[in-house]
Amino acid sequence: MLYFVPAWYKENSWIENEQQWYMRRMKSEFDETIKQITLFHRNVDAKYRIVLLGYSPNFRHFSHRQGMYRSPYWSCFDAIAQIKRTKMAVLSYHDIKWPEGVEFVYSPFSIVALYNGQKYAQVEFGEDGNPIIIDMYEEGQICRRNYYDDRGFVSSTIIYENGQMKYQDYLMENTIWKLRVNASDGSVMVNPSYPMYDTKTGEKQFCKLSYDSLDEVIQEVLSDFVNETGVKDTFFVAVHSLHMKVLGDVIRERKVVYTFFEERYDYSKIHSIKGYLKSSEYIIT
C-alpha cells in the first residue's frame, strides 16, 4: 500500500487552504503530491491512500477540483471527531436556524444578515459556491466564527471575546466539542465526556485530557494509524516545516520517500530535517 501525506495547509497552520471565492489565489493549488496521486490513480494495480493531517472541512471540493474525488483518504481530524460521513451534502444558509425577522442583504461577495437593524452575521462562500464560514456579531464585534464542512454540518467554531479570539472548538457531527484549543498558548483540552477517537479496528481513549499543542494530539492519533499499516508499506511525504517532526518520529519504521516542491519549502533550511532525510528510501526534488 502507498500512502501520500500532502502539505495542503494554510500558511503554517493545521488547516486547509480553502478561501472565499472572490479572493485571488497567490499560489496554485497544484503541487507534486497531486501529480503523484493522479498518476497512481490511473494504475488500478497500485493501492494507495491519502493521509490528511490537517483540519480539512472542504476536502471533497478540493479533491474534485483536482480530479481526485474518488481517491481514498484517511483524515486525522475525522478520526479525532469520530466523523462517519463521507459524502458531500448540499447545505444552504437557509437551512440554518436564524432568529425570526432576520433580513438578508446580498452583496457581490457575501451575504450579510441583519437583525433589528444591526449586523448579525456574514456568510462567506467557497470557490464552488458552498458556504464555508459564517461570522456572528454582537454590538458590531465578531463573537463567533463557524466553519462548515462540505458534508453538511458545522465542524469547528471559534469563540471571540471583545473581538479577540479566545478558543477554537473542533466538533463532532452532533455539534458537541471534542477538542478545545486555547488561543493564548495553543494548549488543547479533550472533552472528558467524549475522550475517544476512531481507529481502524474501533476506537481508543486519548492518553491524556490535556496537551501542550495540537501537534501532540495529531502525533498520537497518527501513531495509531501508522501502527495499523504494513511494515512494507511506503509513505510519500511532501516536505513541509509544519509536519516534519510530527511525521518523522512516527514513520521511522516504514519506508519513506520525501518529496520537495520549490514553492513550498526553502532549501536553505534543509539542515533542520537532515536526520529525517537520512532515514528515507528516496528523495524526490
List PLM regions with ranges.
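Long terminal segments
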Residues: M1-H94, I176-T285
